[in-house]
Amino acid sequence: MKVRASVRKMCEKCRTIRRKGRVMVICSNSKHKQRQG
C-alpha cells in the first residue's frame, strides 16, 4: 500500500474508489494499491 498525496491509475486494471472518505486505488497487481492522505 502506497500512501500518496495524489493517487492515479498506473494501469488499465486499476480502479479508483472511495472508502470512509479516503480515495483509494485497487488493482489486480498488488504493487498498484494506493491510498490518499
UniProtKB/Swiss-Prot annotation:
Any Gene Ontology CC annotation: ribosome
Ribosomal protein is among the record's keywords: yes
InterPro entries in UniProt: Ribosomal_bL36, Ribosomal_bL36_sp
Keyword Ribosomal protein in record: yes
A GO MF term: structural constituent of ribosome
Annotated keywords: Cyanelle, Plastid, Ribonucleoprotein, Ribosomal protein
GO biological process: translation
Localisation per UniProt entry: Plastid, Cyanelle
Family indicated by similarity: Belongs to the bacterial ribosomal protein bL36 family.
Protein's recorded name: Large ribosomal subunit protein bL36c
Native source organism of the sequence: Cyanophora paradoxa
